[in-house]
Amino acid sequence: MMSFSKNATPRAIVSESSTLHEMKFRNFRVAHEKISLDIDLATHCITGSATIIIIPLIQNLEYVTFDCKEMTIKDVLVENRRCDQFIHDDPLQTNLNGLTSQNVLYSDNSIEQSHFLRSKFASLNEYPETDSKSQLTIKIPSSIKISLEDANALSNYTPITPSIKTTPGFQESVFTPITLQIEYEIRNPKSGIKFDTVYADKPWLWNVYTSNGEICSSASYWVPCVDLLDEKSTWELEFSVPRLVKNIGTSKLIGQNGEESEKEKEDTPEHDEEEEGKPARVIKDEDKDSNLKNDEEGKNSKSKDAQDNDEEEEEGESDEEEEEGEEERRNIEESNNPSLRDVIVCCSEYSNIKELPHPIDLTKKKCIFQIINPVAPHHIGWAIGAFNSWSLPLISPPSVDAEDEVEEDKLRENVVDNVNDTMDDDIGSDIIPIQIFTLPTQETDELTVINSTVVCQKIIDFYSKEFGSYPFTCYSMVFLPTAPSKHMDFAALGICNTRLLYPLEVIDKAFSTTNELAWALANQWSCVNITPLDMNDYWCCLGIAGYMVFQVTKKLMGNNTYKYQLKRNSEAIVEQDFEKPPIGSTFTGSSRPISWSSKDLSFIQLKAPMILHILDRRMTKTERSFGMSRVLPKIFLQAMSGDLPNNSLTSSHFQHVCERVNKSKLENFFNEWVYGSGVPILRVTQRFNRKRMVIELGIRQVQDEELGHEKVVGEEGFFKSALDHLEHPDLNRTECFTGSMTIRIHEHDGTPYEHIVEIKDTFTKIDIQYNTKYRRLRKRGGGANDENGVENNNEEKPIVVDVNCLGNVYMSPEECSRFSLTEFNRTSESNELLKQNEAFEWIRIDSDLEWICQMHINQPDYMFSSQLRQDGDIEAQLEAIRYYEDVVVNGGVKSLVYSSILFRTAIDERYFFGIRLAACEALSKYVYDPDFTGGVKHLIQIFQILFCLEDSNIPKSNNFENPKLYFLQCNIPKYLAKVKNENGKCPKLVKQFLLDILVYNENGENKYSDDAYVRSLIENVVKVALNEYKDKAYMEKVKTQLLRYENLVNWLSSYESLIKTTIMYAKYKLHKVGAYDFTELTGMIMHTLTLGINNGDISRESFQNEFLMVLKIMLLEGGLKNKDALVLFTEILCFHEDSYIRDKSVDVLSECVNLVVMDGSLDTISDDIKSSVQSVHNEVKNIKSEDDIELFLSGHYVDDMKIKIEKIGRQNISGLIQICRDMFKGYSPLKILLWDVLNLPVLSLYQRKQIHDLVRVMYTLINSFVVRLETPRERRLVAKMNSNEEGKLDIVIKRESILKVHIKKEVTSTVEAPKKANKIKISLKGDKPVRKVEKQIVKPKVTSKQRKVKSHVNRMGSLPLRFVKIQQQPRVMVHLSSVPYSQFVQITKVTSRSFMVKIRTKNDAKN
């Protein structure tokens, strides 16, 4: 279907349509786009005009196509001449806006045919058909002549992009540029643009902004363009918006109802009038002053020049004072009357904004932006609203010495006094100004904004110095509550969610927000300025940006945090990469469009930067090259100079640059780590050969056997794992990883010796020469405060090495006895004398983190103890703790020695806080034994020492001044909640301790918020209560605390409703096990639905969080099998006024499916009565034989077998997918609603993608569909020729049956009786008897009719009729079975006199 414009003449295009479909290359490039948008916030309408300058790549250019989705094309002009020959083909509107009753695919099909519907939309397919694309096709008039012209001569006429200049064959000459103008209109957009006008009575909170969550599928919803990342051009954006908030939805044309006096009275605020009047008053004052001075000229001793200087200074001071007074008055007016606030346009390159009055409408203004650097349409963004704006203060400009305290104090004073002036003054310098925009709400005040974003200035300054110049002139950030993802990256603009902001009293988001802001700024260099040529090249851009984030983390937070993050990222990759495809081919066969919101790129963001890190380590270690510090600036320089074609980066080009810098081939590295999946798992054996004086190492790769062992579902849940399995059944695992590795051996002289070895096979045997010539003695313990570390004596004595030790706390006998600790020098469960015979202290494999791997080394436990205490490297300490954790978990060892080592590690404040957390987590892995004094008891003692009153479980008043201790305080209860005894239950000791912490928590004297801490405590207490929910006494205490904190948050709301939503979900969990009567569920749902966004008691983010939590509980509490609940859910999904809730609702559905599949809770939910009855009828219809009847009646007997099969199926992802499909295939209401929703035009592109992906997992898609056709007429028209007379021909047309059935007449044969025979007289001799001849009578054959048998049915009871069995016997008998809906009762036989019942007990069912 094609939709034509009003005056279109499609004949000229239809004949050539086949040519358009066969075009497989672009025959033009876009050089420049000028977009004019008139935005109406009140009606959600945008009137746009796009002026596009294209450069033909062929001379006979006949047609051009642009991506246009969900917009109405009003007019098209080519070279300022109207063009009626265009076609706007929008399948999305054509297929979804029509009547669904007339849709052949919709009528008689269901959700199993959803993939046919998906194939109709190009954005949802990897290789879409041409007729499924939403395109505007324009015919270039034949009157326009295209010829080659000089490119330099045309550079003044149109800004040709670098992609054109650097394209081979187009350097000296280009074809004649063509200018097209497209007029269009957008109403109520669903994707690409988001209107937020939910506050009907607060128009100053209305806003509209662009969204690019779906890559290369967002910009075409609001501007005609070629929506590809490599189609870059320069831009000019012109916005027509209301001048003030009160002008929204109004219009006042010039000359209407009076002249401009009306404008001054009604539309211009008072301060504008004052501004116009003040210069005149100043001039008059100057004249008076000059007259007085002329009169007294002879009396004054000053010269004329000095007087003039004094006057200028006084005038400048007075102007500044007047401006400050005007700003103050204006701020007061805006605070008193928000409708007087200015409407602000935030766009790229805000430093060159031009604000002009509207030419015809007095209530509007025009804002014009220019983007000189070529940018793809996907990265053009803007936001409009009555925003507050702040300029970030400058932290340390390059000209100021950071060590000079005096100058730094002066600079700080100047920055505080003149924040806005510094931005204007430094635009031309190396400082990149950053502007922040937020809505005028109480939650986003100046302190909150500056506290969260002040680090951005230092981040962007570090990037520009280390990796190359910032590609734009400025940067702005807009924080909005409805942004679908944490940050959306545009050219010189970032649109972020307000959840990244945090006030001064919240410290939990400090690290996460800083990391997200660092990513947003790094993406400006890589992902915006430099883009991938193909989707599978995205790993390069994300890897570069992530590597930049690593370096700025090292700069801002220190080397320990940097190394700890690297090690944790490596462990996370090992945990997740058992089911992931290679990052170099992730998007081959994957779901489209690629979305930031659905975390399609999350694993690449994790792994790609680590690959660049290990590549950098190998390059700098083996070849002594500069590594990534030379590669990245070289790529950025190529992008700025035009040497990188179209600023599009490919994997092959990135590999080529790395090889040029490294001066060697890296093909094996890229094949193993980029184009292969998985990570190595290394098992290392070591032995010292005293005869040869070498250390013999054996390194074996065992990832084929151990990677993903006993893992079914990844970190992101069942839905993501299932989708990855369906999209990438072949993971292309790397069998053997190769490359260099650094081995560090700490020998007895205290010196670490490094050895670089090469791994070339799955098993590598290495001999490392021993270096120490003389035997050293080692002084154990002590030395914690010795900074020199090594003592050298001139005497001829054995060298004694004094080693600085960590963990040397709680060493006195009293402390060891009180806390059940072993001696500090005892570090092994084996014989301590063995340590004296060892050739080295400890050995580290891959000491420089050149491999992303999991390592197992068979060195003794005392070596790991030395490594933990004496090696200052964070990675070494973490490896040692992982060893103890592995021994406790897999070895089942209850070692007090190991527990004491972990205790001292966790309690020693000199350790990095991440190491202390890891030690606490390792202690929680001990299986609880009342007779064992270590493990869990040590973990409780750590919390008591740090945070409780002496010898009690009552915590001290909270004090979060020390962030390191705060993270310990938050995480130790989480680790305690995981503790189990031998029976898999949580010990009473732990349960009571966690409850005491929650009961006696006190935050009155703390200046920081404890909302996140209380939320964590509630989650942990509920978790241990669910572990043994039959403990009614403990359960009552838990419910009492839930009620207490619920009342508290009702009086004093928590930050983003963290505590309230946690209590809601806790109640659902308790109700699920029968420990809580969830009677208020209905009231809670109704309260949340009727609360409305306009409620001023809570923030917007709090309302959104509460609403989504209620929606989640409703679905889990039976809503997935309740038609009314599903109808409510789909209405929210499609029609809720908050776009954030609409987008996140589909994520809630996916999360609920994850939960019910993993815990099997859907089986405990009863279906609707109507759907249950319908399913019974369907089963009865399928009964065809006696075997089917017996199978139907004995269906409940197969439950045991079903449980066994399900248990086997849960051991792999394929079995889980089948279990999921079995759960949902029989419930028709959900299938019908999902099918109806997919056929509605109200969904956004993200929602449509997510539902299609979810359906692909939940149901088996069938490659056939039902089509209903009209019944053909019984008669058809036929023509017969009759020629009765010569020369005359009659043609008779009449209707004749289509099928002629010739039925033969019945032949009834009647047999006549033969005639009577003539009597023959025979005379015989003698008196003998005469024999008579019998008559031959032939009777006709008569078919006997079937005899009717009367029968009746005796029915027992009122249950639904399930089975009727009729037996044909001499005496007809009818047997009935009336089976109730129970798996324990079965009526096997019923007659008129008796019936048989079979009853099973629960014990029988289990057996």
UniProtKB/Swiss-Prot annotation:
Its main location: nucleus. Present with 1200 molecules/cell in log phase SD medium. Residues 277-307 have a biased composition (Basic and acidic residues). This is Transcription initiation factor TFIID subunit 2. The 1.2 MDa TFIID complex is composed of TATA binding protein (TBP) and the 14 TBP-associated factors. One copy of each TAF1, TAF2, TAF3, TAF7, TAF8, TAF11, TAF13, two copies of each TAF4, TAF5, TAF6, TAF9, TAF10, TAF12, and three copies of TAF14. The lineage of its organism: Eukaryota, Fungi, Dikarya, Ascomycota, Saccharomycotina. SUPFAM superfamilies: Leukotriene A4 hydrolase N-terminal domain, Metalloproteases ('zincins'), catalytic domain. Functions as a component of the DNA-binding general transcription factor complex TFIID. Binding of TFIID to a promoter (with or without TATA element) is the initial step in pre-initiation complex (PIC) formation. TFIID plays a key role in the regulation of gene expression by RNA polymerase II through different activities such as transcription activator interaction, core promoter recognition and selectivity, TFIIA and TFIIB interaction, chromatin modification (histone acetylation by TAF1), facilitation of DNA opening and initiation of transcription. The keyword Mitochondrion does not apply. It is found in: Nucleus. Residues 304-337 form a coiled coil. The modification Phosphothreonine is found at residues 158, 161. GO terms for cellular component: nucleus; transcription factor TFIID complex.
